[in-house]
Design a protein with these regions (language model features):
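Short, surface-exposed loop/turn motifs that are enriched in glycine and acidic residues
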Residues: 12, 24-28, 45
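Short inter-helical turns and helix N-cap capping residues of alpha-solenoid HEAT/ARM repeat scaffolds
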Residues: 13-15, 46-48, 83-85
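Structural detector for internal amphipathic alpha-helices that build alpha-solenoid repeat scaffolds
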Residues: 7, 17-31, 40, 50-66, ...
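Amphipathic alpha-helical scaffolding segments comprising HEAT/armadillo-like alpha-solenoid repeats
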Residues: 1-10, 31-43, 65-80, 101
Length: 101
């Protein structure tokens, strides 16, 4: 069930391994309705870099989403945020440019 997967991805109670698995499934089952939760996850400093990187990779597949402007806005903020790791900023930049072009 797609809704169940989305709920598990957004839940901090779910193990990171499963959250990453659900995150990868977003490439095939784009969950436009839960983009707000996904973007909140990206900006949550308590979430792991590994999970955020995986989520950015998945969001790069949302090229035709009606939520693309929101994803672009957050990716732009992340790629410019010097307090984040270089790896995370680069992934945010890749997602940003893939969606923008």
């Amino acid at each position: 069930n797609t809704r169940s997967m989305q709920k598990e991805l957004l839940s901090k109670e779910t193990s990171e391994r499963w959250r990453i698995l659900y995150c990868n499934s977003l490439k095939n089952y784009m969950a436009h309705a839960c983009v707000d939760g996904l973007l909140a996850l990206l900006t949550d400093s308590s979430e792991s870099e590994k999970l955020k990187t995986c989520l950015l990779e998945a969001l790069a597949w949302f090229t035709h989403s009606y939520r693309k402007p929101d994803i672009l806005r957050v990716c732009d903020q992340l790629r410019k945020d010097k307090s984040l790791s270089e790896n995370l900023r680069e992934e945010a930049g890749r997602t940003y440019y893939r969606l923008k072009n």
